[in-house]
Amino acid sequence: MQISLTVLLCLATGIVSWQALSNSELFSKLSLSPYRVKHNKEIYRIWSHTLVHADMGHLFFNLFALFSFGRAVEHYMPTALFALLYLGAAAFATLPALKKHGDNIYYTSVGASGAVSAVMMLYMFMFPTSELLFFFILP
């Protein structure tokens, strides 16, 4: 049995976020800092910010959405393409912050919402007639 990339992303994000929420140094090191990307060439932050979340609610909703939609999307495309989509969307989502806050030493952001939103949008394009239930009961 092969574990899916979606499950691996959820596990990695959950573990790293859990650790970072109690370790401010790790949280700071992984957060997106457009200033540090631009001036210190810390390019890794374009992707590392997807592994940390502001709080447990933020983490839960991103992981819930990624797990719910990601498994279906990944099932119908090669794993490498799904990985490229996720990483590409994460990078693309940072562009406005990089442009607007590249010289602001105080601005930081965290979370995988940009990448998760891309997975959700792709799900909607792939399965346009799929019925989504809110809170598992409301269509």
Locate each region found by the language model.
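A detector for small-residue-rich transmembrane helices and their helix-helix packing motifs
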Residues: 1-139
